[in-house]
Amino acid sequence: MKLTDVDFAVEASGMVRAFNQAGVLDVSDVHVAQRLCALAGESDERVALAVAVAVRALRAGSVCVDLLSIARVAGHDDLPWPDPADWLAAVRASPLLADPPVLHLYDDRLLYLDRYWREEEQVCADLLALLTSRRPAGVPDLRRLFPTGFDEQRRAAEIALSQGVTVLTGGPGTGKTTTVARLLALVAEQAELAGEPRPRIALAAPTGKAAARLAEAVRREMAKLDATDRARLGDLHAVTLHRLLGAKPGARFRQDRQNRLPHNVIVVDETSMVSLTLMARLAEAVRPGARLILVGDADQLASVEAGAVLADLVDGFSVRDDALVAQLRTSHRFGKVIGTLAEAIRAGDGDAVLGLLRSGEERIEFVDDEDPAPRLRAVLVPHALRLREAALLGASDVALATLDEHRLLCAHRDGPTGVLHWNRRVQAWLAEETGQPPWTPWYAGRPLLVTANDYGLRVYNGDTGVVLAGPTGLRAVISGASGPLDVATGRLGDVETMHAMTIHKSQGSQVDEVTVLMPQEDSRLLTRELLYTAVTRAKRKVRVVGSEASVRAAIARRAVRASGLRMRLQSTGCG
């Protein structure tokens, strides 16, 4: 336990102190709870504990806390958890729920801080309003672009053409982008048949890498269309959601409820990465009558920030009579064995997963050595040397392509299976091979990961790149949403070395070969969604490094985030 935690626990009292000392609550949880209770004149320690666990839930990705199940979920049976009925009664009676409320209860069990209550309520209301704001229109001939053999995609397009908000979900290789490109051609045809102007279309994704992949995939599919369809669509580009909404440092987005987006059709890819807060900003900026198409894989990891919006939308819309979810299930892209592995993970079949990992298939490798370092070195060092060779030649296209040949993915940043440890280890191995000091901060061939948005440079959190040698010194080339960006290394502030990266950061990208470094089986981050996300980053080969116990632990554990959005969407109202 950190010294600061112990010091703060001395100042805390009652239940909050006990939970802080047990490691369930950290300093920030306790501080917020004490501050809010003091301002409201709330003296009941059960309410203080409720506030603290609500703040804790946000750190874990939930937008609220379920007071009826938190004791079981938190896994500390030895702590003095309040009786659930008494706990809820104390919260209901708290001045923190008075007007103006600091806390809210939904379904008499889910406790929210005010901001997230309002955002969830707003997302529900805005999406349902968009759902019903489009007037019925004629549907073009779907079989023209979705002939026999494209039945799932044709049904998805039919759904999207008939409603204002569409959730299009499916795993990798199921044809989501193919469906989107051809759907957009039909949307343009639909407008033409109705005598309307050509629709203004926006393509967006949460990260620059995801936006670049979306743009590339849509362009590739558009090239297969006839000249009339291509002319209807015009030249489509993809941007990050932050750029679409007009992000301004230290201020709200430029596009909001008072200044709506001008587009008739907005497509968002990798929606599983979108937090509740970002979805609230997007939904309020979409003008009435526009068509919103949310694309993603609901079985992947949810956003780094609070919320599991895509999964909630799938579950919430699925039971409504006025909203259909477009689901694609048949994979066309993967080598059969990787797709089968991903499906076994998604289904939670641990025996099938381990059977595939040990099958000896060329596209799948399982490394369960007690010390995997020698086998990892044989993979990581040759890749790093190929990257260095391209970088020394200043060959930006070759370097970026080489970068995407392989990724080492970790669940954690810290610890023996974490990103920081393996970045240092690969740099040390490189130093042995090249003689370059491992502490050199900038060097040709250094793989880069952007960790914060820089709107001036147009580089965004999650973008990747490489440091290149040039006639005037080192430069960085970043794989941005609109193509490669050449940037002076001195202008890049928030970047880190990317010989390894977290699985969360890998979302929105795919590479030829992936090595997944599993943490110990007791890791809190180890979930089915984590392993599924990691495996589905691979196009050609996946290598899983870890024990059988860690694989089984991942398969058995689901990433569950508390939220009321699903229930709100299923009910008659959002409040």
UniProtKB/Swiss-Prot annotation:
Disulfide bonds: none annotated. ATP binds at residues 170-177. The keyword Isomerase applies. GO terms for biological process: DNA recombination; double-strand break repair via homologous recombination. It catalyses: Couples ATP hydrolysis with the unwinding of duplex DNA at the replication fork by translocating in the 5'-3' direction. This creates two antiparallel DNA single strands (ssDNA). The leading ssDNA polymer is the template for DNA polymerase III holoenzyme which synthesizes a continuous strand; ATP + H2O = ADP + phosphate + H(+). Gene3D superfamilies: P-loop containing nucleotide triphosphate hydrolases, RecBCD complex, subunit RecD, N-terminal domain. Keywords: ATP-binding, DNA damage, DNA repair, DNA-binding, Exonuclease, Helicase, Hydrolase, Isomerase, Nuclease, Nucleotide-binding. GO terms for cellular component: cytosol; exodeoxyribonuclease V complex; peptidoglycan-based cell wall; plasma membrane. Disruption phenotype: Not essential for growth. A helicase/nuclease that prepares dsDNA breaks (DSB) for recombinational DNA repair. Binds to DSBs and unwinds DNA via a highly rapid and processive ATP-dependent bidirectional helicase activity. Holoenzyme degrades any linearized DNA that is unable to undergo homologous recombination. In the holoenzyme this subunit has ssDNA-dependent ATPase and 5'-3' helicase activity. When added to pre-assembled RecBC greatly stimulates nuclease activity and augments holoenzyme processivity. A helicase/nuclease that prepares dsDNA breaks (DSB) for recombinational DNA repair. Binds to DSBs and unwinds DNA via a highly rapid and processive ATP-dependent bidirectional helicase activity. Unwinds dsDNA until it encounters a Chi (crossover hotspot instigator) sequence from the 3' direction. Cuts ssDNA a few nucleotides 3' to the Chi site. The properties and activities of the enzyme are changed at Chi. The Chi-altered holoenzyme produces a long 3'-ssDNA overhang and facilitates RecA-binding to the ssDNA for homologous DNA recombination and repair. Belongs to the RecD family. Heterotrimer of RecB, RecC and RecD. All subunits contribute to DNA-binding. This is RecBCD enzyme subunit RecD. The lineage of its organism: Bacteria, Bacillati, Actinomycetota, Actinomycetes, Mycobacteriales. The gene is recD.
